Amino acid sequence: MSEPHLLIDAGNSRIKWALADARRTLVDTGAFGHTRDGGADPDWSRLPRPRGAWISNVAGADVAARIDALLDARWPGLPRTTIRSRPAQCGVTNGYTTPEQLGSDRWAGLIGAHAAFPGEHLLIATFGTATTLEALRADGCFTGGLIAPGWALMMRALGTHTAQLPTLTTDIASGLLAGAQAEPFQVDTPRSLSAGCLYAQAGLIERAWRDLVAAWQAPVRLVLAGGAADDVARALTIAHTRHDTLILSGLALIAADAADPATAPD
C-alpha cells in the first residue's frame, strides 16, 4: 500500500488536517489552533509517516512557521508543498483575471466540490471569518465569486464600532436564537443583532443563488461549508447540501495528481 498524504488547511480561525489514503479517502482528521495558547498541538504520534504534506495556508507566515515546526518535530525532513491557485488544475479552470490572487483555500475547495458533485452547476458558500461564494459550472469553469464579512465578523464590527450594542460571539448568538420564535423580528437587542446579521448572511446567499440560476438558466446546487453553516442553514428558504471537507478533499486530489497525473479528474 502506498504511503498516505498529510493534508493541512490553515484558515483564518484554526488549522484542520487529514490523512488521505491511496483512494483519496480521508481516514483520519483533526484540528488545532494557530498558537499553543489556542489549544493543544495535534497528536500525530500514532500516524504513519506520510508521503508528504500538502498545505493550504491563508493565515500568514507565523502559522506557516508553526506548521513547519510541528512537521519537523514529528517527521524530520518530510517533503511539503504549500499550494497556490493555478489557471487550471484537477479539472477546474480558474476564471480570475489574475488566477494566483484566488485564495488557496478557495481553490482547493473548488477542486473538492467539482469532484464531489460531478456534472452539476454549483454555488459554494463557505462561512468562516469571511463568507465566500464561488460559482462553479458543471464543466469545471470557476466563473467568479463574492467575499463578505462572516457572521462573527459582522457582529464583532457592530459591537466594536457602536457605543451601546454588545459584542457577541457566534456561540452566544446561536444560543440566543436557538429558542427564538418563528417571527424573524426579535424583542431584545442581543437577539435583534444576532438575527439581523444572520439574515444578512442568508439574504446574500439566496440573492446570489437566484441570480446565478437566472444567469445560467439551469439548476444550481447550493453547497454550504464552514463553522456557521448550521446557523445560516436554519435561516435559508432554499434547498442546500452540507459538505465540510471540500478543502481537504481538494488537497487530496491535488496531492494525488502530483504523485500520479494520470489519476487526476478530467
UniProtKB/Swiss-Prot annotation:
Cofactor: binding details: A monovalent cation. Ammonium or potassium.
EC number: 2.7.1.33
Gene Ontology cellular component list: cytoplasm
Primary residence: cytoplasm
Cellular compartment(s): Cytoplasm
Annotated active site: 105
Listed cofactors: NH4(+); K(+)
Biological pathway: Cofactor biosynthesis; coenzyme A biosynthesis; CoA from (R)-pantothenate: step 1/5
Cytoplasm recorded as keyword: yes
Domain of life: Bacteria
Annotated catalysed reactions: (R)-pantothenate + ATP = (R)-4'-phosphopantothenate + ADP + H(+)
Binding positions (substrate): 96, 103-106, 189
Single Gene Ontology MF annotation: pantothenate kinase activity
Residues engaged in binding ATP: 9-16, 129
InterPro entries: ATPase_NBD, Type_III_PanK
Gene Ontology biological-process annotations: coenzyme A biosynthetic process
Keyword line: ATP-binding, Coenzyme A biosynthesis, Cytoplasm, Kinase, Nucleotide-binding, Potassium, Transferase
UniProt subunit comment: Homodimer.
Family indicated by similarity: Belongs to the type III pantothenate kinase family.
Function: Catalyzes the phosphorylation of pantothenate (Pan), the first step in CoA biosynthesis.
PANTHER family: TYPE III PANTOTHENATE KINASE
Name by which UniProt lists this protein: Type III pantothenate kinase
Species this protein is from: Burkholderia cenocepacia (strain ATCC BAA-245 / DSM 16553 / LMG 16656 / NCTC 13227 / J2315 / CF5610)
